[in-house]
A protein has these predicted regions:
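Interdomain "pre-motor" coupling segment immediately N-terminal to P-loop NTPase/helicase cores
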Residues: 9, 13-67
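N-terminal pre-Walker A segment at the start of P-loop NTPase domains
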Residues: 71-94
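Pre-Walker A (Motif I) flank of P-loop NTPase domains
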Residues: 98-103
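The conserved Walker
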Residues: 109
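Conserved lysine of the Walker
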Residues: 113
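Hydrophobic positions on the alpha1 helix immediately C-terminal to the Walker A/P-loop
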Residues: 116, 120
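Post-Walker A helix-loop "phosphate-sensing" segment adjacent to the P-loop in P-loop NTPases
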Residues: 122-134, 144
Length: 248
């Protein structure tokens, strides 16, 4: 490495444009007739792509997904006609986030609700949106602990900053009045400001089994379903169907 190369790497590091330090690779791949402006453009493209990749990585890590699932891996053939592949493609465009709409997925266990929620969250991350994935029961515990430890406001601000909040499994545990009030506030604060995805195996008529305050249940459903897409995903179990196919 000559002195010029060393200086280029040094300045690239100081200016935080590491892709420019790899200019020799761009030169090797470039058209021999390319001019200086063409080479500069290729370097800028490489730097932009690198930054986008790093940002995507950070967003994925911050989202807190328990595992990664994609839209391409989701088998929508077992869903009812109300949830068409075309509609899923529309959701995957993340226009619902741009429109500040919610998505409510209702279906029996094993219907692929969590898979679909994660896949939509992954799409959102790659499109530049900040996403948070939270199990509903875990979040209610975190909210209570945050309040007891006098940093509830900090957690609420973190949740509010998410362009998309995914509340998974809002059905397996019931919530006491204290937990209900904290969850309600989180959802209420997001209404018409940002998007929320909720997965649950209970129809709205059974949500009174989850929360002590029936009046709050009506208000919660009202907040969630306003400007929302409600997906009825009931039918044969997605996991059961996959298991039977593996045995065949």
């Amino acid at each position: 490495m000559n002195a010029v190369d060393e200086l280029i790497r040094l300045y690239a590091k100081q200016l935080k444009i590491p892709s420019f330090a790899e200019y020799q690779e761009v030169l090797r791949q470039a058209d021999p007739s390319a001019g200086f402006s063409d080479l500069l453009l290729e370097l800028m493209k490489a730097e932009t792509a690198s930054r986008q990749e790093n940002q995507n990585r950070r967003r994925l890590k911050a989202a807190g997904f328990p595992y990664l699932k994609t839209m391409e891996e989701f088998d929508c053939s077992q869903l009812n006609d109300a949830v068409s592949p075309l509609f899923l493609q529309e959701l995957a465009s993340c226009q619902f986030i741009q429109n500040r709409q919610n998505v409510i997925m209702i279906g029996n266990p094993g219907r692929g609700k969590t898979h679909l929620a994660i896949a939509l969250g992954l799409k959102a991350c790659t499109q530049g949106y900040n996403v948070l994935f939270k199990n509903a029961a875990t979040l209610s515990t975190e909210l209570c602990e945050a309040k007891d430890n006098y940093h509830l406001g900090r957690l609420e601000r973190t949740l509010a900053k998410a362009d998309l909040l995914i509340l998974d499994e809002l059905s397996y545990l019931s919530f006491n009045r204290h937990q209900s009030e904290l969850l309600f506030k989180v959802i209420s604060d997001r209404s018409e400001k940002s998007s929320t995805i909720v997965t649950t195996n209970l129809p709205f008529s059974n949500w009174t089994d989850l929360f002590e305050n029936t009046t709050m249940v009506a208000a919660l459903i009202d907040r969630l379903t306003f400007r929302s897409h409600v997906l009825d995903m009931n039918g044969d179990s997605y996991r059961l169907k996959a298991t039977m196919q593996n045995k065949a």
